[in-house]
Amino acid sequence: MKTNNVVYCGNVDNKLVGKEVVIKGWIKKNRKLGSLIFIDIYDITGIVQVVVEEENKFFNNCLQTPKESVVEVIGIVRKRSNVNKELKTGEFEIDLKEFKLYSKAETPPFLIQDDTDGLEDLRLKYRYLDLRRPVMQNNIINRGKIINLFRSFLVKNNFNEIETPYLSKQTPEGARDYLVPTRSKKFFALPQSPQIYKQLLMVSGMDRYFQIARCFRDEDLRADRQPEFTQIDIETSFLSDLEIQSIVQEMFIYVFKEFFNIKLKTPFTRMSYSDAIEYYGSDKPDIRFENKIMNLTNYFKDTNFKIFKSIYESKNRISAVFVEDNIVKQDIKKLEKLAQDNKAKGLAYLYIENGKMSSGSIANVIESEIIEKICKDNKLSNGTLFFVADKYEITQQALGAIRKEFVNISKKIKMNEEFAFLWVVDWPLFEYSEEEKRYVSAHHPFTMPTAETLDTFDKDPANAKAIAYDLVLNGFEIGGGSLRIYNSELQTRMFKFLGLNDSQVKEKFGFIINAFKYGVPPHGGIAFGIERILMIMLNTNSIRDVIAFPKNSSGVDLLFETPSDVSNESLKELGIKLEK
């Protein structure tokens, strides 16, 4: 008679020894040793071993059932004679009495195990198989747990979870919108963020809002980007930027304590945008290690090295970064290409021994006494010193990329901590777009200028500052926020500076300008990219590893083969004609 004692594979334990149980799951492997068959059956909780004796009527069925088939087994739990310490259930096995095949599996296209042989695109094509791997299941399960920790903290701190629409209005926010055609021959747009909605909720008096929001951006993809992604979106009324940052810090303290049982180093480090560029060559620096960029321009005032002399006289920059390791030539070639990819004309280097120059690409043309003074002043002893000489923006960008690469090519980089949070503050209000030949918002057009630049931001945009703040974790921007403009005249002035005329302002943003006429509180907020946070917390190589069904690096869903063509009938019904 069948038992009702259904047990998950990973939950077989000492309390069940001698009892009859039912387990249901997938066959990980089966092997015949003499007169016995050993079957490893797994489910989402783990693996358990099943033993089938030769005289058992299901012996041949078990032997012939392929891996990854779905089965049900009834049997008696007993202690194993040879314990497998790598398994949670390694002390136990199940003596099979009955066997049922639910679904027979074909041979999978790759090994379904953590150290799989499947390349990423193949695994994405068969994502339902990839998600059987324990590491992937843990990622997806932990995603839900971590999101719920964020939600729990915010609810406890009087934030209201409010959903905003997916079918929205097209707005110029820096990336391309996904447009949704309708039968009325008009279009919705999928939101790049709930920015305007959450500001309107502040006008509505909702005080503290949050949402686990889906966002959509049709832009170039990188290792840490997806066309659709999830944000923890937050907005508050009447709080200062420092008060918002304090809540955020407490939120991460709570999440990391609950998930990892660790105490984060607090308060989070603060750094101005200009210092981040000056010392790290990045607006999202990884501060787990030092290796700061050095301004060495003045050391070369009297050099005979023509390139550096020319840079000094033209009032450009000679910057350098040092690593306490002798970087091999093969890796130097990689760094040279990396510098060129970041607009530098070249990368010079010197090997330093005991505070003196020993060799390198410019060792024959640079004065040794200058290098010795640099080493003495900056306490450089043994390692490799890299130089870029160019315009300031280029030297910092190139050396910032090289500094970041040190982690991958040198084993001597000393990480000070596992998780290094950093607030980057004092942002410029605008950045200059070489492509558009004009100033654009560094964050978005709703960002409040600082009090010092409130009257001059549209006359002197290069020096305009924003009350904006980014949160960086281990060299990744995980969140960005600001205080918002809450005056309709100031908001209109901002739109006009950004190139919108009166009719465009009315068409695209008339609703928020009108809302601001009916009493709007000072407000501000922040939004966090869930996938980037998870990628760091769960130590994965890509955000695709923490999304159940992601797109690949080209924005293609290989499982569903989308984006895909649409029938002419569907296009005709929507009044759309595609150009060839």
UniProtKB/Swiss-Prot annotation:
Region (Aspartate): 195-198
InterPro entries reported for this sequence: Aa-tRNA-synt_II, aa-tRNA-synth_II, aa-tRNA-synth_II/BPL/LPL, Asp-tRNA-ligase_1, Asp-tRNA-ligase_1_N, Asp/Asn-tRNA-synth_IIb, AspRS_core, GAD-like_sf
Residues that coordinate or bind ATP: R217, D218, E219, Q226, E477, G529, I530, E531, R532
Top-level taxonomic group: Bacteria
Signal peptide: none
EC main group: ligase
UniProt xrefs under HAMAP family: Asp_tRNA_synth_type1
Family note: Belongs to the class-II aminoacyl-tRNA synthetase family. Type 1 subfamily.
Reported function: Catalyzes the attachment of L-aspartate to tRNA(Asp) in a two-step reaction: L-aspartate is first activated by ATP to form Asp-AMP and then transferred to the acceptor end of tRNA(Asp).
Protein name (database record): Aspartate--tRNA ligase
